Amino acid sequence: GGGWAVERMRHEPDQGQDQLGDLVIGRLEGSGSKRVLMIGHTDTVFDTGTVAERPFATDGDRAFGPGVTDMKGGLLTGFFAVEVLQAAGFEDSGRLTHFCNPDEEIGSPWSRETILAEAGRADAALVLEGARENGDIVSSRKGVLDVRLEIEGRAAHAGVEPERGRSAILEAAHKTVALQALNGRWPGVTVNVGVVHGGTRPNVVAERCVLEVDVRSPQEATFAEAGRAVEAITNEHTVPDVTVRSIGNGWHRPMEKGEGGAKLAALATQVAAELGFDLKDAATGGASDANTTSGAGVPSLDGLGPIGGDDHGPREWRDLSSVVPRISLLAGLLSRLEGI
């Protein structure tokens, strides 16, 4: 409804891959010249069956349920904001694309190329993730690099001939200390070795160990430097004769608040003031599809959904009293984009 031309792309998984939901793109032509890309995701982090265990519920001004703020609220905000403008007879927005992808929570590996293609045709990107708990919208996000290091040594009996062994766990320990030591080297850059698993028995020198590492940076330059530092630690061995394989498990470029993003944030603040509420923009360490649009050079603004919190957790909530103000905010923003 609402005049949207809808395109639906079916995911064809490779062998061993999970089947993702459809990628759905709605397009609406207005009389304005600006091309606006709105992005929301249809997937959540929760396992099948979670809704049966914890169905949608409300308590006063709060709604609870899996994905209620991340990000069913934002998805609907996009549609309702356009409905509000249509009901008001406003037809001066330009070409509007509402992009609904099914794989954001795993880093948008399938939809990213299509996001980049759409971003290449857009003057602005509005990402509909939930607003922060304090109501802030999001103008910058850290870039994220996930790396898996697979370390292989040589097994040996720890009591009989330990000298023949080459401990993958010892090498992993050295690398863990070196990686964690990168924290504080650059402003805002964090490195976390979040998963370690290796070895088989206490009396065997460990042949294998795996590290999973999370690297985050607020700026493109330090993101690249941190990536090179991780690579150097990967390639520098303390234990002789070990081999290390580095596998990239996904990445997002930083969403930096450039001139275009700052203009969008200022416009949103102005619209909110006219609607009668204060609005601030903030930086956050988590990534979203706004990292992709911003990295492609498109002025981007995020956190435009309703207020919510405890994303990914059992008490995930949405502030119902924020729904109408945030729909109004997005509608106002869409109606003013011709002016920037």
Model region roles, listed by residue range:
Residues 71-142, 184, 338:
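Acidic/histidine-rich catalytic neighborhood of metal-dependent amide-processing enzymes
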